From Swiss-Prot:
InterPro entries: PsdUridine_synth_cat_dom_sf (IPR020103), PsdUridine_synth_N (IPR002501), PUA-like_sf (IPR015947), PUA_sf (IPR036974), tRNA_psdUridine_synth_TruB (IPR014780), tRNA_sdUridine_synth_fam1_C (IPR015240), TruB_C (IPR032819). It comes from Shigella boydii serotype 4 (strain Sb227). Substrate binds at residues 43, 76, 179, 200. This is tRNA pseudouridine synthase B. It is an enzyme of class 5 (isomerase). Keywords: Isomerase, tRNA processing. GO terms for biological process: mRNA pseudouridine synthesis; tRNA pseudouridine synthesis. It comes from the Bacteria. CDD domains: PseudoU_synth_EcTruB (cd02573), PUA_TruB_bacterial (cd21152). Pfam families: TruB-C_2, TruB_C_2, TruB_N. NCBIfam families: TruB. The gene is truB. Belongs to the pseudouridine synthase TruB family. Type 1 subfamily.
Length: 314
């Protein structure tokens, strides 16, 4: 006879996990999901196993709004090994070419400048983008290269940190869809020596505060602490969560009176004062400003529901 399945928790919110090196984003997600005993969770914007840093984990209804984090800008610290090119553009791959490092400081500065601003980038074959329904890295592992179109990205800031020996350290603030491994590989080719990533840390996602990041070790320590104090682990874990609407924090807020919000929550567009002329909005209700979903201003100036929060019974 099978054991009864433990009932998970319907929790909502976003945890800013500091992903450890050597672990896939999905493995990290599953570990956090078990620690929180959550029924539903997903991550936004996968990090390579080699990479560390901010990985937002969305619980429950927050998963509905995770797309807004995928669309947000990000900041990274990266260290490149010069003189070696690998098949994956990072240290997890095989070295495919070695060349001497002979560029000058002036040549480096000029090369870096070509990556600032609006540029186009051809994604790496070792990425999760799909071609004919199959992920690119699945083709790459079979030794197959498929055509990829260049995609527009924006490098808002590219800071030179240091160049010592065959190591180059940079900090990069970039738009969604930017592959740091590809930037380093392309930079290595511009410098004529080849390069690959040996260290990568995501410092920030959108406007999330870096001081709210937590490690798996800290989460486990809180669970142990709760057991010692004979209290539910949720009492120590849940205060770490950011609000479920935080992925959409860049959008303006429209507050509806309770008399209007009931229609909005039933799927109907409503009129209200103080709404912007167009675009997406975060919708709250009542005096306490409870978040109830995302809306969009329609052609008649009404707030039309786009994504609604489902309220589960306690």
């Amino acid at each position: 006879m099978s054991r009864p399945r433990r009932r998970g928790r319907d929790i909502n919110g976003v945890l800013l996990l500091d992903k450890p090196q050597g672990m896939s984003s999905n493995d990290a997600l599953q570990k956090v999901k078990r620690i929180y005993n959550a029924n539903r969770a997903g991550h936004t914007g996968a990090l390579d196993p080699l990479a560390t840093g901010m990985l937002p984990i969305c619980f429950g209804e927050a998963t509905k709004f995770s797309q807004y984090l995928l669309d947000s800008d990000k900041r990274y610290r990266v260290i490149a090994r010069l003189g070696q090119r690998t098949d994956t553009s990072d240290a997890d791959g095989q070295i495919v070419e070695e060349r001497p490092v002979t560029f000058s400081a002036e040549q480096l500065a000029a090369a870096l400048d070509t990556f600032r601003g609006d540029i186009e980038q051809i994604p790496s074959m070792y990425s999760a983008l799909k071609y004919q329904g199959k992920k690119l890295y699945e083709y790459a592992r079979q030794g197959i290269e498929v055509p990829r179109e260049a995609r527009p990205i924006t490098i808002y800031e590219l800071l030179f940190i240091r160049h010592e020996g065959n190591e180059l350290e940079l900090e990069i603030h970039c738009s969604k869809g930017t592959y740091i491994r590809t930037i380093i590989d392309d930079l290595g080719e511009k410098l004529g020596c080849g390069a690959h990533v040996i260290y990568l840390r995501r410092l920030a996602v959108s406007k999330y505060p870096v001081e709210r990041m937590v490690t798996l070790e800290h989460l486990r320590e809180l669970v142990e602490q709760a057991e010692q104090q004979d209290i539910p682990a949720a009492e120590l874990l849940d205060p770490l969560l950011m609000p479920m609407d935080s992925p959409a924090s860049d959008y303006p807020v429209v507050n509806l009176p309770l008399t209007s919000s009931v229609y909005f929550k039933n799927g109907n567009p409503v009129r209200t004062s103080g709404a912007p002329l167009e675009g997406l909005v975060r919708v709250t209700e009542g005096e306490n400003g409870k978040f109830i979903g995302m809306g969009e201003i329609d052609d008649e100036g009404r707030v039309a529901p786009r994504r609604l929060v489902v309220e589960y019974p306690a």
